[in-house]
Amino acid sequence: AMIGNRTMIDMNAVIGSGAQIGDDVHVGAGAVIAGMMEPACTTPVIIEDGVFIGANAVVAEGVRVGHHAIIGAGSVVLHDVEARAVMIKAPAEKIRERTVDDEQRLCINQTLRKKEVGDHFFDETMD
């Protein structure tokens, strides 16, 4: 798999070997991103930059998820997802576009990615 910068992959997530994941993506615990090499698939899973994939969600083989989309927990994505779409259910359906409120709720992921936060945390605990 190809995994971008500042991407977070939570515990028990499965990333197929042919998957391509962009920068600043969050893959929730137990999520499955297909992308198996055997049997070979002509179209890999592509997760563009800034996507949030909830816990236990599944992105099927050959799907492209557009930048800054949100895939809800437990959703099963069988078809391509537009940029900034919010998808839920199994099979996944678009319910709306990503909003400013979504950005604020997801900002914790950006905070956790910053090296300064980790350094500050470790500095305090080392005293």
What annotation goes with each model-predicted range?
Residues 1-19:
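Internal active-site segments that recognize and position negatively charged phosphoryl groups
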Residues 17-127:
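Glycine-rich hexapeptide-repeat left-handed beta-helix
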